[in-house]
Amino acid sequence: PFFFNDTATTEIYTLSLHDALPISGAGKKSFVAGADIGEMSTLTPEEGEAFGKKGNDVFRKIETFPIPVIAAVNGFALGGGNEICMSCDIRICSDNAIFGQPEAGLGITPGFGGTQRLARIIAPGLAKEIIYSTKNIDAAKAKEVGLVNEVYTQDELLPAAEKLANKIAKNAPIAVRACKKAINEGLDLPMDEAIVVEEKLFGSCFKTHDQIEGMEAFLTKRKEKNFINA
């Protein structure tokens, strides 16, 4: 997973003018390889904690990236591969995708957010079963339990991710970014506090170029819109 290291995520942040970012593995066998077991095998407790923090810092950058990130999962997404997948806003996969957290069989816990994100995305009881038993789930099961939104053939996967990114890109970037911020921040708050977050972000959209452009286009029945994220 450290393909997405600090340098890589910093470079990704330079793409912030884009409206959505699909990510996928190279090839059809795996989405992202997990951490190097040989490297981890000699870590001390302090080094293990630091290793986990390194991964979590990277994955949080993806999770809090200003624009929507779409994971197009092809093949295996195990351990860190599943954890980076869960850091993305939207997950779709190919019909050969396999998801799982094998860490307990190695004598460790998931270390890059797996215990926290999986239990927030799917039912906590099922998340516990997957983590405790180290069982893998296939693409059909992943869709059934809400880990992914859709399943495609291997050839359809990347075009589907690009199509979804383009569909998102047709909307006002300033609004989409505010929606992401509202959802992500609100999930960690009591409802009364979360509603206040939404109200503030809702208000922040008014008198922006994109709000004026979007509403003018609607009122005049103009199809073309010139959104500029401002």
Functional labels for PLM-detected ranges:
Residues 1-19:
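Positively charged, low-complexity/disordered segments
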Residues 216-230:
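Terminal low-complexity tails and localization/encapsulation signals of metabolic enzymes
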Residues 16-43, 61-72, 90, 94-98, ...:
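A structural preference for short, pocket-lining loop segments at secondary-structure junctions
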Residues 92-97, 139, 148-196, 204, ...:
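C-terminal long alpha-helix characteristic of the crotonase
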Residues 19, 90, 129, 133-135, ...:
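Well-ordered beta-strand positions
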Residues 58, 62-64, 72, 78-132, ...:
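CoA-thioester-processing core
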